[in-house]
Amino acid sequence: MHTILLVVFMIILGAIIGGVTNMIAIKMLFHPFKPYYIFRFRIPFTPGLIPKRREEIARKIGQVIEEHLITEELIRQKLNQPQSRNMIQQLIHKQISKLKNDDVTIKKIAGFLGIDVNELVDYKLTTKFLNKLNFWYESNKYRKLSEILPQSFLDQCKGQIEYITDFLCERARNYLSSEKGERDIYELLDTFFNEKGRIIGLLQMFMTKESIADRIQHELIRLTQHPQSQKIITKVLNDEYETFKDKNLDEIIKEQQFKNYSQLVLNELKTYLNLKDKTERPIKQVVPQFIQFLEDDTSKRMTDFIIKGTSKHLTNIMKKINLRQLVEEQINTFDLKYIENLIIDIANKELKLIMTLGFILGGIIGFFQGVIAIFV
């Protein structure tokens, strides 16, 4: 009886030691959050591993996301996919549809170009109109757009940038929240794990690829909602808008294109003999064919222009956004307690398994110690 009690006692003692040791080891990953000192000497293992390596972890995560998850090539591929093209074209169609409901008149457009519509009635319409437009283009083609357009119009365009930022963030959230976005993140993560081999395989001791992909998805979605992200996107759009304003007119529209559009407007004006009356009526009533032209032809060209322009300047855009630094700064702002809860939430089952394994191994070792103690 004494022998059995000895073995049982050693098993219980070994299990307690093994389990508690693993529990302490897990706790030491996170705690303490700050270093402790005795006199001038720092107590070993303070702070915990994750608080101590926090900046390095943030830097590595930012590097992984920038180099392997959200890359320039991936964004270019997404931009050139039919779904993205259709989405952009639908947005342009939506804006053209709004034009149908606006009370923009030819008189306002002509006045914007410096043309007195009433004076056109007294001159040969064709010669006067085309000559005036061509003269205006020749006079302004080497001027910057910001020097040509009224300041009120430029301010109105600039005011739309925040709406574009909200739209981009919303589309990003919709994509990341979709099944396709979830699948793409998992596939990228799976490719990354396969490329990195054993080192990354150690991470799977604490969490599965599914849980990591799920967490990345949630954090990326949260990132699109973060004010700092929206602020950076708005800044990039503002910078690109300022660059666009500084382009010369002939960089935006070529001479032949300008002549084609001028001729189109002229043909529509010649359709109406009562020019003064017609120019004061909304475009949607006067020249519905022009709206149709915008819908059928211009929207496609604008879509191609947006996609090609974005792809061309994507490197500069990514540099200005600095995704790696953005992620690193965001992670460094997280409260350590939040990071602890986040990791425990992801790897809860695995951590419990490690603690259970400590109890089991400790019990087994205690059993053999008890057996050895009997014969010693």
From Swiss-Prot:
Subcellular location: Cell membrane
Positions of disulphide bridges: none
Matches recorded under InterPro entries: DUF445, UCP032178
Membrane topology: Multi-pass membrane protein
Keywords, sorted A to Z: Cell membrane, Membrane, Transmembrane, Transmembrane helix
UniProt superkingdom: Bacteria
Cellular compartments per GO CC: plasma membrane
Transmembrane segments: 4-24, 356-376
Family statement drawn from the similarity comment of this UniProt entry: Belongs to the UPF0754 family.
Record-given protein name: UPF0754 membrane protein SERP1382
Organism listed in the record: Staphylococcus epidermidis (strain ATCC 35984 / DSM 28319 / BCRC 17069 / CCUG 31568 / BM 3577 / RP62A)
